[in-house]
Every structure is written in structure tokens, then in C-alpha cells.
From Swiss-Prot:
SMART domains: G_gamma, GGL. It comes from the Eukaryota. The gene is GNG11. Guanine nucleotide-binding proteins (G proteins) are involved as a modulator or transducer in various transmembrane signaling systems. The beta and gamma chains are required for the GTPase activity, for replacement of GDP by GTP, and for G protein-effector interaction. Gene3D superfamilies: Transducin (heterotrimeric G protein), gamma chain. GO terms for biological process: G protein-coupled receptor signaling pathway. One of its GO terms (molecular function) is G-protein beta-subunit binding. This is Guanine nucleotide-binding protein G(I)/G(S)/G(O) subunit gamma-11. InterPro entries: G-protein_gamma-like_dom, GGL_sf, Gprotein-gamma. Disulfide bonds: none annotated.
Length: 73
């Protein structure tokens, strides 16, 4: 299936697509950034105690820890 190039469409088709997109966007539920950012911040802070990227991985449970040294003789 060939790619659709907007610039190749007639003006009427472009306007139809734009109206279609605007109809989809107007149905979206919107929230204030201040409220959403506070919720995201709380979510992150609540889970940071279990986050291995924040608290680290215990040495005994680290799957990437070298098991021993390599000796070439």
C-alpha cells in the first residue's frame, strides 16, 4: 500500500481530513496540567521505594554482577 502524501490530495480532501481530526480531538477529555503533573509526581514518589533504578539492586540479587574473574594460563 503506497504512502499517503497530504500535499497530493485535492484541497477538499485535505479540509475533510482536518475536520475529521478536529472532531476526534474535541471528544478528548482534557485536564489541567497542574492537576495531572501533581498526580504523576505523587505516583512516582509512591513507587520510588521499590524502583531499582532509584534505590539500586542488592549485590546478591544483581544478575549482571560478575560471578568470578577470568584466568588465562
Amino acid at each position: 500500500m503506497p504512502a499517503l502524501h497530504i500535499e497530493d490530495l485535492p484541497e477538499k480532501e485535505k479540509l475533510k481530513m482536518e475536520v475529521e481530526q478536529l472532531r476526534k480531538e474535541v471528544k478528548l477529555q482534557r485536564q489541567q496540567v497542574s492537576k495531572c503533573s501533581e498526580e504523576i509526581k505523587n505516583y512516582i514518589e509512591e513507587r520510588s521505594r521499590e524502583d531499582p533504578l532509584v534505590k539500586g539492586i542488592p549485590e546478591d540479587k544483581n544478575p549482571f554482577k560478575e560471578k568470578g574473574s577470568c584466568i588465562i594460563s
